[in-house]
């Protein structure tokens, strides 16, 4: 598949005994989304990720949600990361770095991205309540960290996500997803001043 700026599209699929997931992402889209995971709150978060990243994002996931949401959420992070990595291609001409602060009522979240080819994840600052809160009867907010970590490792990016402050687990989760979306949008954006790979090593 070509990975020019006119065709920065990535697709990935993964099928296991726990889930069957397919993802398509267009980095140069307009924020159109088509999301179906069987988990309404997770659908809401992925819709926000696509919309605020200005990515055209399609996610189809069938998982053992009757047992737990964990497998579907984490495996979606894996497949989305793989699709994102494919869409990035050689990474020529991109800004490479991006970050964003996102408020949601009482909460403030920050995300920073380096499209480095060196996968790493750091998540910090979430209040203790996030460990045992369940949103909508199906989305345990402790899964946030697993999703972002698997996304980062499979996209081969460095991703840092911070909750600076906040009380409502819904607000914290949504602010984090939106911060990641905006940081990714900035990092993958084309920069006319960058004529090749944005690294002094000549490769990412």
Curated annotation (Swiss-Prot):
Source taxonomy: Bacteria, Bacillati, Actinomycetota, Actinomycetes, Mycobacteriales
Subcellular location field: Cytoplasm
Catalytically driven reaction(s): D-erythro-1-(imidazol-4-yl)glycerol 3-phosphate = 3-(imidazol-4-yl)-2-oxopropyl phosphate + H2O
Entry's EC annotation: 4.2.1.19
SUPFAM superfamilies membership: Ribosomal protein S5 domain 2-like
GO biological process: L-histidine biosynthetic process
GO molecular function, one term: imidazoleglycerol-phosphate dehydratase activity
Keyword Lyase attached: yes
Name the UniProt record assigns to this protein: Imidazoleglycerol-phosphate dehydratase
Keywords tagged on the record: Amino-acid biosynthesis, Cytoplasm, Histidine biosynthesis, Lyase
GO cellular component terms attached to this protein's record: cytoplasm
Pathway: Amino-acid biosynthesis; L-histidine biosynthesis; L-histidine from 5-phospho-alpha-D-ribose 1-diphosphate: step 6/9
Family: Belongs to the imidazoleglycerol-phosphate dehydratase family.
InterPro entries (UniProt xref): IGPD_sf (IPR038494), ImidazoleglycerolP_deHydtase (IPR000807), ImidazoleglycerP_deHydtase_CS (IPR020565), Ribosomal_Su5_D2-typ_SF (IPR020568)
EC category: lyase
């Amino acid at each position: 598949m070509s990975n020019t700026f006119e065709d920065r599209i990535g697709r990935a699929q993964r099928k296991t005994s726990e889930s069957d997931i397919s993802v398509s992402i267009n980095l140069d889209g307009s924020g159109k989304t088509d999301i179906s995971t069987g988990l309404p709150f997770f659908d809401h978060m992925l819709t926000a990720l696509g919309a605020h990243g200005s990515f055209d994002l399609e996610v189809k996931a069938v998982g053992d949600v009757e047992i737990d949401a964990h497998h579907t959420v984490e495996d979606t992070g894996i497949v989305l990361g793989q699709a994102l990595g494919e869409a990035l291609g050689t990474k020529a001409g991109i800004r490479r770095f991006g970050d964003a602060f996102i408020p949601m009522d009482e909460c403030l979240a920050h995300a920073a991205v380096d499209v480095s080819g060196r996968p790493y994840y750091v998540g910090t600052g979430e209040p203790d309540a996030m460990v045992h809160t369940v949103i909508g009867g199906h989305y345990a907010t402790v899964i946030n960290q697993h999703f972002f970590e698997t996304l980062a490792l499979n996209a081969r990016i460095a991703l840092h996500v911070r909750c600076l402050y906040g009380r409502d687990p819904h607000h914290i989760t949504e602010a984090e997803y939106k911060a990641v979306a905006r940081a990714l949008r900035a990092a993958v954006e084309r920069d006319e001043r960058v004529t090749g790979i944005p690294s002094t090593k000549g490769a990412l």
